[in-house]
Amino acid sequence: MTKYLLICLVVCALIFQGCWHHESAVERGYNEKYIGEYTRKIAFPIGGIGTGMFCIEGTGALSNMSIRHRPNVFNEPTMFAAIHVKGYEYGTRILEGPVPEWKKFGAPNSSRGDGGSWGMPRFKEYSFQSRFPFAEVELADQNVPIDVKLVAWNPFIPTDEDNSSLPVAGFEYEFHNTSNEEVQAVFSYNSMNFMQTPGRGKAYIDAAKNGFILRQTGTENEPFCQGDFMIYTDNPQTVVNHNWFRGGWFDPLSICWDNLEEGRMEENPAGLEG
């Protein structure tokens, strides 16, 4: 069993929200795990008090990215964790459950295919459980010899408003080998620079210990455009690719996924804008 801790450090002003699933309230006991239709509209708020927010959904996806004092329920940036299990034909998966049907026509431009990573394979079985400030997502798939448990948490400490107001969120991933053989796998966390505001300063990916920072500078007239979002892990053997393939349309994401499917760990330095 392997366990990793992924920390999201949001050094910009955010906000927060929540919701998810439906299936006949009679069929589900009070405070039990959410499964099936019950998970469809869950959005559990993550972030420190007064720091802004994003949400972890019932499938494990991230959405409601509300930054720069702007609540935005449709802001679902392309960012995801993934696993590649070596030697398995279908062993590469985003660490989320299937995308809910309602989303495919529910967000701006979604009918035109602007669904970010929606077309990538995900785990077929999943459940969600919340015990504030913790949210827990469990994932399983018969094609992948690894079960996954994700625990996401807020920096909420009763009577300690200072530490409870830190702009951080914690994501702990636990992997369990369900086969009778040794398994080799590559875990990755991937994100486009959703901090970017075109035409307002410069956007780039900066280096951080065991991770990376999504940066956007401000301008003299619009200094409020400046913002930073750091993603890092406590694993000292982390390899970071700061620059995806530069191309048009969906080329960057497609090449990123090709690398994930091949278990390729590219290490590119920071420095390029965009």
PLM region spans:
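C-terminal motif of bacterial Sec signal peptides marking the signal peptidase cleavage site
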Residues: 17-18
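Residues that flank catalytic or metal-binding motifs in active/ligand-binding sites
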Residues: 40, 49, 79, 131-133, ...
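Polysaccharide-binding surfaces and accessory modules of carbohydrate-active proteins
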Residues: 155-262
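Beta-strand-rich N-terminal accessory domains
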Residues: 22-99
